[in-house]
């Protein structure tokens, strides 16, 4: 009797638009279409990394409930329009951009001054309209993040440095706009009880639909890999090693450098300054210990905790016989 589960062999990508596609995979054993389709959909909607405007400073504006002479939109509408600009950063996690324009006319995302490693996917997106004599001068902070972050939850390492007039935005980092999936019937030779999974996805253009599905699958693999380490009812990663300080007794994720956590540059540099090079080093530190690190404040701590939680880890964990022998402490 055949006991091996079928694995999908045929993958078809159908482009429905510039940022809209269907990805079909088959064949799956009966039931696996819904099992994997629902998991991929939830990850695509909640856990994709992207870029968004998080803070704005507008010349002559102290708060968002203001209006600007010569600008048709009030500040609230300008901020709403700004949230529709799609940014893509290369080789950096945050950047502050400038937008300066005066005179009658339309202000679009194309008017934002960007360095060579910052891309605006929708340059024709309208931000504001200026009347005769109108002027708009603003600084826009763009950051890398995951999912959705309300502005009232953002914390600053030092409130004293918070400048007057800085407006914090609710940030939707996810590059995925819509996701749905359907399960159809598939056939292999004489078997007709198989599933075909069709995932329909629309993005904002910062990532292709195929890359988004690929990234979501990678996240699922990383999460499920922890279950493969189960041994004796506990995670093998935290069991005492069977050999003399051997790497085999630790979960592979703990041996990865902290750079793979994709933290902001500020957070990553603070950790390296404290000789925290590996994820295994990091999870053994407590919140209080990290807060004593120079230049690492509550905002960075929350970021670290969220990234670790997405991988099933927390601060303050105990690892016996860490570090393993031969681990490079660069």
Curated annotation (Swiss-Prot):
Residues 1-231 are annotated as: Alpha N-terminal domain (alpha-NTD). It catalyses: RNA(n) + a ribonucleoside 5'-triphosphate = RNA(n+1) + diphosphate. One of its GO terms (cellular component) is cytoplasm. Pfam families: RNA_pol_A_bac, RNA_pol_A_CTD, RNA_pol_L. Residues 250-330 are annotated as: Alpha C-terminal domain (alpha-CTD). GO terms for molecular function: DNA binding; DNA-directed RNA polymerase activity; protein dimerization activity. The keyword Transcription applies. Keywords: DNA-directed RNA polymerase, Nucleotidyltransferase, Transcription, Transferase. CDD domains: RNAP_alpha_NTD. Its EC number is 2.7.7.6. GO terms for biological process: DNA-templated transcription. InterPro entries: DNA-dir_RNA_pol_insert (IPR011262), DNA-dir_RNA_pol_RpoA/D/Rpb3 (IPR011263), DNA-dir_RpoA (IPR011773), RBP11-like (IPR036603), RNAP_asu_C (IPR011260), RNApol_insert_sf (IPR036643). NCBIfam families: PRK05182.1-2 (NF003513), PRK05182.2-5 (NF003519), rpoA (TIGR02027). DNA-dependent RNA polymerase catalyzes the transcription of DNA into RNA using the four ribonucleoside triphosphates as substrates. Belongs to the RNA polymerase alpha chain family. Homodimer. The RNAP catalytic core consists of 2 alpha, 1 beta, 1 beta' and 1 omega subunit. When a sigma factor is associated with the core the holoenzyme is formed, which can initiate transcription. HAMAP family: RNApol_bact_RpoA. The N-terminal domain is essential for RNAP assembly and basal transcription, whereas the C-terminal domain is involved in interaction with transcriptional regulators and with upstream promoter elements. This is DNA-directed RNA polymerase subunit alpha. It comes from Verminephrobacter eiseniae (strain EF01-2). The gene is rpoA.
